[in-house]
Amino acid sequence: MSHKQIYYSDKYDDEEFEYRHVMLPKDIAKLVPKTHLMSESEWRNLGVQQSQGWVHYMIHEPEPHILLFRRPLPKKPKK
């Protein structure tokens, strides 16, 4: 599979999560399941490479070739 064609967005966040999206080329996108969110082993098997802790959290129906990921931000110590 062509890992060079996978595009990784910059990371962005809110108060709770860090987010990123990953755009897959058409040949890989056709392998994305339409019935469920992928486990880490499933998206890694497609060639997506990112650190541990990312969760495929949403399917964007109009653009199924874009995978939406998030992971919890580290808890800030209370002052």
Swiss-Prot record:
GO terms for molecular function: cyclin-dependent protein serine/threonine kinase activator activity; histone binding; protein kinase binding; ubiquitin binding. One of its GO terms (cellular component) is SCF ubiquitin ligase complex. Keywords: Acetylation, Cell cycle, Cell division. The keyword Nucleotide-binding does not apply. GO terms for biological process: cell division; regulation of mitotic cell cycle. The modification N-acetylserine is found at residue 2. Belongs to the CKS family. Forms a homohexamer that can probably bind six kinase subunits. Binds to the catalytic subunit of the cyclin dependent kinases and is essential for their biological function. This is Cyclin-dependent kinases regulatory subunit 1. It comes from Homo sapiens. The gene is CKS1B.
